A protein has these predicted regions:
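A short, Lys/Arg-rich alpha-helix, primarily the initiator
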Residues: 1-24
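Helix-turn-helix DNA-binding elements, focusing on the entry/boundary residues of the two helices
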Residues: 17, 28, 44, 59-62
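Short alpha-helical DNA-recognition segment
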Residues: 25-49
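DNA major-groove recognition helix of helix-turn-helix
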Residues: 35, 51, 61, 80
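DNA major-groove recognition helix of helix-turn-helix/homeodomain DNA-binding modules
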Residues: 54, 58-75
Length: 82
């Protein structure tokens, strides 16, 4: 499978995930633990790579990030400001 870059990044949601995580005062390890409780196997280092854009984000993870961070998928994708 070929993974493409968009403006040098492997995802567009990383900054929004970092913003939502920081607003809730969650560490990267806390977010990884919440994702694991929802059935996504992910570690703190993967969250770090995701936030800086060096990790591809599978589509099935987006609704789970939205759920645990209490935001919409549209917001994560930068389609809305709220």
């Amino acid at each position: 499978m070929k993974i493409y870059n968009f403006h040098g990044k492997k995802n567009i949601v990383g900054p929004r995930i970092r913003e939502a995580r920081s607003r809730q005062q969650l560490s990267q390890a806390d977010l990884a633990a919440k994702m694991q409780l929802e059935g996504v196997v992910i570690e703190q280092n993967c969250i770090s790579r995701l936030e800086i854009g060096t990790r591809f984000v599978p589509d099935y993870e987006l609704p789970i990030y939205a759920k645990v961070l209490h935001v919409s998928v549209e917001w994560l994708l930068g389609m809305t400001n709220e």
